[in-house]
Amino acid sequence: MRYRGWCLCFLLAVSSALAPAAEKPLATRILIVKSTRTMTLFNGRKVLKTYKVALGTAPVGPKRIEGDHRTPEGIYTIDAKNPQSRFHLSLHISYPSVAEREQARRLGARPGGAIMIHGLAPDFAYLGPLHRKVDWTDGCIAVTNAEMEEIWKLVPVGTRVEIRP
């Protein structure tokens, strides 16, 4: 009887050690807060992870027109993933909305586009987290390449993105 108890304990220990690790749940929402330079991934109400980010070189205020170097503000969606991005990997954000296009048209300009969450270009990958010391993008949200690899796995196309001032 004692022998069976030890065998059972041994089998339970071995089976739990061999069981695949539980995968992290996927993000259902991304919250980017420009004033704190943070991006938080959520699954429901549960925080999966928060990252420090770099923004466009003119970070205050919402994006209005192409070339203003601002990061947009509003509710968007991840509508594409680009594994061949020149900034390591990238997730395309659905900016501009219909209203943002119309606003740019009224200003006699184009709204711009190609707003992404992305990593670092190969020539600057060595900077790692130092890249966050200054806002340097054309309006995108930048993280390190290691962070982007993690984000890439956690964020499916269709994920909601909220960008706040």
Regions found by a protein language model. Name each.
Residues 35, 72, 111:
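Exposed loop/turn and edge beta-strand positions of beta-sandwich/beta-sheet ligand-binding modules
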Residues 1-7:
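Bacterial N-terminal signal peptides that target proteins for export
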Residues 20-66, 164-165:
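Intrinsically disordered, low-complexity
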Residues 61-78:
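Short, surface-exposed secondary-structure junctions/capping segments
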Residues 25-26, 67, 80-165:
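Exported/periplasmic cell-wall-interacting domains
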Residues 7-15:
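Bacterial N-terminal signal peptides
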